[in-house]
Amino acid sequence: ISVRMNYLPAKAAFASTLQNPQLGYVSRYALGRDYHKLLRQRLKKLGDQIQAYCGELNFRPFVDSAPVMERALAAKAGIGWVGKHSLILNREAGSWFFLGELLIDLPLPVDQPQEEQCGRCVACITTCPTGAIVAPYTVDARRCISYLTIELEGAIPEEFRPLLGNRIYGCDDCQQICPWNRFSQLTDEDD
């Protein structure tokens, strides 16, 4: 079972923060509670409810916590399609959402995957400050500002430092420019 949880806050001041060198830019997903814990708790509750209804079964929730191919599963489950920036896009919600999976040993019907809808758009590719989207659907993590500011152990390579601007934790440029995100739904979460 693949699920999504919106995280776009009502007061998402992307441009004003990025344009103000006195402020540090933090990726939108990191502004609220730890989504790993929150979504995992909800998936566990869903598993418990399914078990209460169906009887004994095995299940395990995953939220970016194991080598589970979340995007591939979400695409196959019909949550959306893989955009050229390599994120899942949804016609009604854009890409501002988290993914989670509940692996379960219960046969369930499978939803139809959505067709790719990016067409000729290359906005995410051309806006990437470091050229990390090296081809449609291909991101070179070693160039991605999100990787460089969150995952990289050690110093950020000198060639990328001027391109960071005031980004101190993550980068949302490819999502901000994506036309599908004009349909994004605000989060129901209060933080």
What label would you give each PLM region?
Residues 123-147, 153, 167-190:
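Iron-sulfur cluster-binding cysteine motifs and their immediate structural context
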Residues 16, 20, 69, 121, ...:
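A sequence-level detector of short, solvent-exposed, charge-rich linear segments
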Residues 115, 147-162:
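Short helix/strand-bridging catalytic loops that position acidic/His residues to coordinate divalent metals
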Residues 110-119, 160-171:
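Immediate flanking context of iron-sulfur cluster ligation sites
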Residues 2-117, 156:
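Auxiliary alpha/beta "docking" domains used to position bulky ligands
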Residues 1-13, 86-91, 127-143, 190:
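Phosphate-binding glycine-rich loops and adjacent basic patches that engage nucleotide phosphates
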